[in-house]
């Protein structure tokens, strides 16, 4: 199936609640989803580096 059809399928209410899964709203990626931000790791990193996520900064130690 194409990515767009899978995104539409993920938005529908499943027959059983355990079947529901999260997708990144920007790219539609189903894996590496960060619940706190509602993004996948790749989109999270891009937005954080551009300064679009308030309170997020690159760690350094």
From Swiss-Prot:
Its cofactor is Zn(2+). It comes from the Bacteria. Zn(2+) binds at residues 24, 27, 40, 43. GO terms for molecular function: rRNA binding; structural constituent of ribosome; zinc ion binding. One of its GO terms (cellular component) is cytoplasm. Binds 1 zinc ion per subunit. Keywords: Metal-binding, Ribonucleoprotein, Ribosomal protein, RNA-binding, rRNA-binding, Zinc. Gene3D superfamilies: 30s Ribosomal Protein S14, Chain N. It holds the Pfam family Ribosomal_S14. GO terms for biological process: translation. Belongs to the universal ribosomal protein uS14 family. Zinc-binding uS14 subfamily. Binds 16S rRNA, required for the assembly of 30S particles and may also be responsible for determining the conformation of the 16S rRNA at the A site. PANTHER family: 30S RIBOSOMAL PROTEIN S14, SMALL RIBOSOMAL SUBUNIT PROTEIN US14M. NCBIfam families: PRK08061.1 (NF005974). Part of the 30S ribosomal subunit. Contacts proteins S3 and S10. This is Small ribosomal subunit protein uS14. The lineage of its organism: Bacteria, Pseudomonadati, Thermodesulfobacteriota, Desulfovibrionia, Desulfovibrionales. The gene is rpsZ.
């Amino acid at each position: 199936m194409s990515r767009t059809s899978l995104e539409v399928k993920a938005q529908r209410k499943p027959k059983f609640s355990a079947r529901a899964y999260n997708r990144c709203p920007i790219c539609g990626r189903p894996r590496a989803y960060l619940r706190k931000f509602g993004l996948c790791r790749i989109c999270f990193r891009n937005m954080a580096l551009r300064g679009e996520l308030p309170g997020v900064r690159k760690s350094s130690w």
